Regions:
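Juxtamembrane/disordered regions of integral membrane proteins
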Residues: 1-138
Length: 138
């Protein structure tokens, strides 16, 4: 495929993952529990945790875009073509990087495992969405 088409696929995967992440952290899903655990862990207040979308969304988009580019490069290099392989690579990337590095806060900074699980559930879901979209659109 051409570079323009590939970039479009990467952008769509990024946006889809962000939308899923936004739903994940809504109050009616895991948002209320996440907020409660984050306040307990960090000492932040409700005011500290008020969304600042003009600042937060562009940063979240940028880091998710980096992830999608890396997923694209890995899937392309490994010639991943099936749905099952897409989900396997998503799990492998999450387990090898997201799960391992994010566990440091639980191991060394006494972050509660429940907060870690909420965040890592989102990471895994977003990784799976990115991988699935990019592999199925190849």
């Amino acid at each position: 495929m051409g570079i323009t088409t590939d970039l479009m696929h990467i952008l769509v995967a990024t946006i889809a993952a962000l939308l899923a992440g936004m739903i994940w952290y809504q109050p009616f899903v895991f948002g209320n529990r996440w907020k409660e655990l984050t306040k307990e862990y960090t000492g932040m207040t409700d005011d500290d945790l008020k969304p600042e979308p003009m600042r937060q969304i562009p940063m979240w988009f940028f880091v998710t875009l980096i992830n999608a580019i890396v997923v694209y490069l890995v899937a392309d290099r490994l010639d991943i073509q099936s749905r099952l392989s897409a989900l396997k690579i998503a799990f492998a990337l999450w387990a090898g990087f997201g799960l391992t590095f994010s566990s440091w806060a639980v191991i060394f900074a006494r972050q509660r495992q429940s907060l870690w699980l909420i965040n890592n559930g989102a990471f895994l879901m977003m990784q799976a969405i990115i991988c699935f979209i990019l592999v199925m659109w190849r």
